[in-house]
Structures are given as structure tokens and as C-alpha cells.
Amino acid sequence: WFDDAALFACAVLAAWRAGARVLLLPNTARENIGWGETADIFLTDNLVHKQAWHLPECLAQAQRQPENGRQPENWSVPADAEAHLKTSGSSGKAQIIIKTAAQMQAEAQTLAAALPFGRNGEAVIGSVSPQHLYGFTFRFALALTMGWTMERAQAVYPENLLAATAAHRQAVWI
């Protein structure tokens, strides 16, 4: 579970690059934490579970390590990398939806073609978490595909949406 959309994006891309299957919890309810524990590793940016790898601590640890000057030649993500999204169940029983990296990129490109901003868009501001199906599509895939700014915090209240929007020339709300 991630509150910070940028840390979420880093974790998803790193997991995909490593060949891991990503489970996106819709919230931190006990049932969903249990589902998350079926993964090989549970990454988060908050302390929702004591066995989780708290990403800010991992990043701080990594920064203390000696630097490796070599960079991988290819940072690409496999097209068949999977994200498993669990719906909230608000319209019945929660369901698991599987999206591949290729599907997410295709969805993002289709959305980008429909929006009036093109590559000149400024930011994606979300009232939903990046783990949500719409958040994953807009706050993650669309922002990364188009090179737009990803507002890190979820705008829980309307005044948060307005404040975040004021900082950008153009913004997409989700």
C-alpha cells in the first residue's frame, strides 16, 4: 500500500523489472493485507504491517551503500509484467483484475489521444489512490507514458484538488 504516488510508481516499475508479479491492494482492510501477504515481498511507504518492507527506510539504506557506477543498458519493463488489482467490492464481491504493462501502456496512449493536452500536459492529480484501477491508469500509466508530473499525495478533499491544480498550468483530475 502506498500513499505517495511517485514511490508507488518506483516500486511497481522495479518489481516489474525484477520479474515480480505486483498485487495492488485497494485499501488496508485486514482482508486486503492478508491478500498482500501472499506476495513474496510486501512493499509500502507507511507502516501498515510490521513485516512490510517500508520503502522510505529501504531507500535510506540504499543511499548509504557505495554507488555502483554501472547503469543497466536497458531499463525496459517486460510487456507481460502483471499487476493484480483487487476491486473494492462496492458493487458486490471484490474481484481481481489482471493488467499487463503492455495493456497499461496501450490504455494510457488511448487516453492521451483523447485528452486535449498531448505531451504538453502538466500534471495528474488524483482523488483516488494509485492502487485503484482509475488511479493506476491515470496517476501511474498516463503520467509515466506522457511524461507528466505525478502529484504525489492523494487529494482527499476538494480543496486539496484545487490547491494542487493551482500549482500547474494544466492538470487532469482523477
Regions flagged by a language model, labelled:
Residues A39-L47, I98-A114, R119-I174:
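AMP-binding/adenylate-forming
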Residues E57, Q61-K86, F117-V124:
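Conserved pre-ATP/AMP-binding loop-to-beta segment of ANL
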Residues A20, A39-F42, L47-Q65:
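Active-site regions of enzymes building and remodeling cell-envelope glycoconjugates
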Residues L7-F8, R30-G34, L47-W53:
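Short, charged/polar "capping" segments at the starts of alpha-helices
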